[in-house]
């Protein structure tokens, strides 16, 4: 077993402090395989270690507060962004966040790849629309490309539910969603109607709504609704999930973050999703969206005003690290 020197020093210190101890420091250090000078240095810096431990614990409490915000698990990046949005903002190095999470055993579940299971087809199909989007998910700007899909939610207690969503490919904002216990196409049409009702002003004739080749999106009623709403339609190639990858990824993260185990009814499911959507749009910060939430990022793109103050790295400290020869000494 590879025991750190600091742990050996601590054992030696506790042994020396025992009233019935008959062993001297030299013998204990030799038996532990450490030097006397190293042990005395350990004793000399004891106060500094205690202060560091106290500081670490206080910082960990701040990290824990950010981690527990709204009840959804967060990784180091999400905690870093949450700290920036606190009042007042807390600036903490992400390496320190990772170190303290590891030190105190705070972990965020990492989503594992899972093959996407297709839902049972429920209605007749019509024409397949060309893949106009061609995976250009984010290059066209906000409200230009909308992604839509359906996923199922099951926990063994509540009825099986189906969730239809429409998200902005650029800002990742959830613009419309509907939950249903049936695969009948009405709830998919209602999702589009909600989109038009709440976001018509920000849409244009160039706005593209992209989906897979599910029967709902090939139905005559859906395609007519899209045309009547003055939107354009695009579809992924058959059996190619990569053509709608951001939407697939979105559902994966959603199921990771929402705890459906306590839901006993459709209403419980609805409440859980409504709370998460509000959190996701307003307080779930995304690293690739300049550390902003989807709604904040949309406002930033519209106004050009960045809402956060992020400290720049200490250039002097960086230069000291680069030119410090002790950092680059290697043992033979």
Q: Where do the PLM segments sit?
A:
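Residue-centric detector for conserved, function-critical "anchor" positions
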Residues: 1-24, 53
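Basic, flexible linker segments flanking DNA-binding modules
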Residues: 3-7, 29, 38-141, 294, ...
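Structured, non-catalytic alpha/beta "coupling" segments that mediate domain-domain communication
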Residues: 13-42, 103
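Mobile genetic element proteins and their domesticated derivatives, centered on retroelements
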Residues: 28-29, 39, 63, 79, ...
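Mobile-element integrase/transposase regions
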Residues: 90, 94-165, 190-194, 198-199, ...
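RNase H-like two-metal-ion nuclease catalytic core shared by retroviral integrases
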Residues: 119-120, 211-213, 219-220, 235-255, ...
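Acidic/histidine-rich, metal-coordinating catalytic segments
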Residues: 202-217, 290-294
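C-terminal domain-tail junction helix/linker
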Residues: 227-231, 255-332
């Amino acid at each position: 077993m590879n025991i750190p020197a600091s742990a050996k020093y601590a054992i030696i210190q506790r042994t020396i402090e025992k009233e019935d101890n008959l062993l001297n420091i030299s013998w204990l250090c030799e038996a532990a395989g450490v030097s006397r000078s190293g042990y005395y240095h350990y004793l000399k810096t004891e106060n500094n270690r205690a202060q560091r431990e106290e500081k670490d614990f206080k910082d960990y409490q701040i990290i824990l507060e950010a981690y527990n915000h709204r009840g959804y698990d967060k990784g180091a990046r999400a905690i870093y962004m949450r700290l920036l949005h606190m009042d007042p903002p807390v600036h903490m190095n992400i390496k320190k966040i990772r170190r303290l999470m590891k030190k105190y055993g705070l972990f965020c579940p990492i989503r594992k790849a899972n093959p996407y299971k297709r839902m049972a087809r429920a209605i007749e199909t019509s024409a397949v629309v060309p893949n106009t989007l061609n995976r250009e998910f984010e290059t066209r700007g906000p409200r230009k490309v909308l992604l839509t899909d359906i996923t199922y939610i099951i926990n063994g207690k509540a009825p099986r539910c189906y969730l239809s969503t429409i998200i902005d490919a650029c800002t990742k904002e959830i613009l419309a969603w509907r939950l249903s216990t049936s695969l009948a196409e009405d709830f998919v049409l209602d999702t589009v109607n909600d989109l038009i009702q709440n976001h018509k002003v920000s849409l244009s004739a160039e706005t593209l709504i992209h989906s897979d080749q599910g029967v709902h999106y090939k139905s005559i009623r859906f395609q007519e609704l899209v045309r009547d709403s003055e939107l354009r339609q695009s579809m992924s190639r058959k059996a190619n999930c990569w053509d709608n990858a951001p939407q697939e990824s979105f559902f994966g993260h959603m199921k990771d973050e929402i705890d459906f185990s306590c839901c006993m009814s459709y209403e419980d499911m609805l409440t859980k999703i409504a709370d998460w959507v509000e959190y996701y749009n307003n307080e779930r910060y995304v690293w690739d969206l300049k550390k902003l939430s989807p709604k904040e990022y949309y406002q930033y793109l519209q106004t050009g005003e960045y809402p956060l103050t992020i400290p720049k790295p200490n250039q002097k400290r960086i230069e000291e690290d680069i030119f410090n020869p002790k950092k680059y000494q290697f043992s033979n």
